[in-house]
């Protein structure tokens, strides 16, 4: 069979390492793409490149996914200001940007064949497949799903498959399944999957309470039209801001939680997650919005935001409704300009100061203190504002009498 080009989303792990010889034996010339979304250091990037070469790929490409994940997801998530089911901040949404990198490479090679290493048991397969299908007429090959039709112990099968072909398997035993990127870390497996208390080993960036600094941390974040642009007065790119906030707030244990929720495929999922930088950004942005948006904006916007979050979580990243909702979210940010001061003493973060020319206040008015209207005006407002409830009570009280 003549070789056909196929582009594989590659991470260097067991699953995607297995995919390379498997696809080659199906007659494909395998081209790998590693989209670095912030979860590896330089040594790991080097390992991934060498691993791809060792396994015999036709070409390998490493893509800096930081700018894409900021512009394509983080900005919109912060505008939305919501988490999935009120808690989980969508930490594996880098999958959509990985798909974009894979499809760009496929288009450059003139092929419609793409592959990923997702299993047939989780959410990621849905996100990968829907994101691919939404962007063109591509052929999706998912080798791990294929072998699950015949093998129950797939990882053991993959390991044996590689060893039989002379490829080593990385001796890196992990008690947990870990996903790490610029957004944060998720951990599952072990006692987490057994609905038990996570052990101390189930920890990524966030320091335990015993290691928190004794002095409080104060950080100022500047926003322009809802986008963070500077930290403590220093302009930074989006990815730089998130990296800096991750480091600062992780040392105080901020952004760590245990989440149980409804997965795309209908099962209950349980993870430990850590998102120190995102937690800080969301806290600061929400405090600024509270001060500068109108009452009606602050009431209505969460409805839009929750739907946007649901679409992203469930794989509908390219659905037209998501684009429609983002148009509203972006419009709502026109006056979200200012600087928020955050403070943490460990475990949680609070917005302690707000500076903005758009704060909706009046020189002559301070809530519950002073006002530039008279007593009669206040009484008249209360009478009209509560008219419906007052009439209801009056009418029905008369009927009962």
Curated annotation (Swiss-Prot):
Segments forming a coiled coil: none
Homology family: Belongs to the argininosuccinate synthase family. Type 1 subfamily.
Query: What is the uppermost EC class here?
Result: ligase
**Where is ATP annotated to bind?**
9-17, 35, 117
Q: In which pathway does it act?
A: Amino-acid biosynthesis; L-arginine biosynthesis; L-arginine from L-ornithine and carbamoyl phosphate: step 2/3
Q: Does the keyword Nucleotide-binding apply?
A: yes
Locate the residues binding L-citrulline.
Answer: 88, 93, 123, 127, 273
Q: Where in the cell is it found?
A: Cytoplasm
Q: Mind telling me which CDD domains this protein's record contains? A: ASS
| Chain residues that bind L-aspartate | 119, 123-124
EC nos: 6.3.4.5
Name the UniProt key words of this record, in alphabetical order.
Amino-acid biosynthesis, Arginine biosynthesis, ATP-binding, Cytoplasm, Ligase, Nucleotide-binding
What's an example GO cellular component term for this entry?
Answer: cytoplasm
- State the protein's name: Argininosuccinate synthase
> Which Gene Ontology molecular function entries are recorded, alphabetically?
argininosuccinate synthase activity; ATP binding
Q: Which reaction does it catalyse?
A: L-citrulline + L-aspartate + ATP = 2-(N(omega)-L-arginino)succinate + AMP + diphosphate + H(+)
The family database entries (PROSITE patterns) matched by this protein are listed as:
ARGININOSUCCIN_SYN_1 (PS00564), ARGININOSUCCIN_SYN_2 (PS00565)
Q: How does it assemble?
A: Homotetramer.
């Amino acid at each position: 069979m003549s070789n056909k080009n196929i582009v594989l989303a590659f991470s260097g792990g067991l699953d995607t390492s297995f995919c390379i010889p498997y696809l080659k034996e199906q007659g494909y010339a395998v081209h790998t793409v590693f989209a670095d979304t912030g979860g590896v250091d330089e040594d790991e990037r080097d390992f991934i490149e060498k691993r791809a070469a060792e396994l015999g790929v036709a070409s390998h490409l490493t893509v800096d996914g930081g700018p894409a994940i900021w512009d394509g997801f983080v900005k919109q998530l912060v505008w939305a200001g919501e988490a999935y089911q009120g808690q989980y901040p969508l930490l594996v949404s880098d999958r959509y940007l990985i798909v974009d990198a894979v499809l760009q490479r496929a288009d450059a090679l003139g092929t419609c064949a793409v592959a990923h290493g997702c299993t047939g048991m989780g959410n990621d397969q849905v996100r990968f497949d829907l994101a691919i299908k939404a962007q063109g007429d591509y052929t999706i090959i998912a080798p791990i799903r294929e072998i699950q039709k015949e093998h129950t112990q797939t990882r053991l099968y993959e390991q044996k498959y590689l060893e039989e072909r002379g490829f080593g398997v990385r001796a890196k035993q992990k008690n947990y399944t870990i996903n790490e990127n610029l957004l944060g870390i998720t951990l599952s497996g072990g006692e987490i999957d057994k609905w038990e208390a996570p052990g101390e080993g189930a920890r990524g960036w966030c320091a335990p309470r015993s290691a928190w600094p004794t002095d409080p941390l104060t950080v100022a974040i500047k926003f322009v039209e809802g986008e963070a642009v500077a930290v403590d007065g220093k302009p930074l790119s989006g990815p730089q801001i998130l990296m800096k906030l991750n480091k600062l707030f992780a040392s105080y244990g901020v952004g760590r939680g245990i989440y149980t929720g409804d997965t795309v495929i209908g099962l209950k999922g349980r993870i430990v997650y850590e998102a120190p930088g995102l937690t800080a950004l969301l806290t600061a942005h929400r405090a600024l919005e509270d001060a500068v948006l109108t009452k009606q904006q602050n009431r209505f916007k969460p409805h839009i935001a929750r739907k946007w979050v649901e679409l992203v979580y469930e794989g509908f990243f390219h659905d037209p409704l998501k684009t429609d909702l983002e148009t509203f979210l972006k419009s709502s940010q026109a006056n979200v300009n200012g600087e928020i001061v955050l403070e943490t003493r460990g475990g949680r973060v609070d917005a302690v100061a707000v500076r903005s020319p758009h704060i909706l206040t009046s020189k002559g008015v301070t809530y519950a203190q002073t006002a530039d209207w008279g007593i009669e005006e206040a009484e008249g407002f209360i009478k009209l504002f509560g008219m419906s409830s007052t009439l209801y009570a009056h009418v029905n009280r008369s009927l009962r009498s």
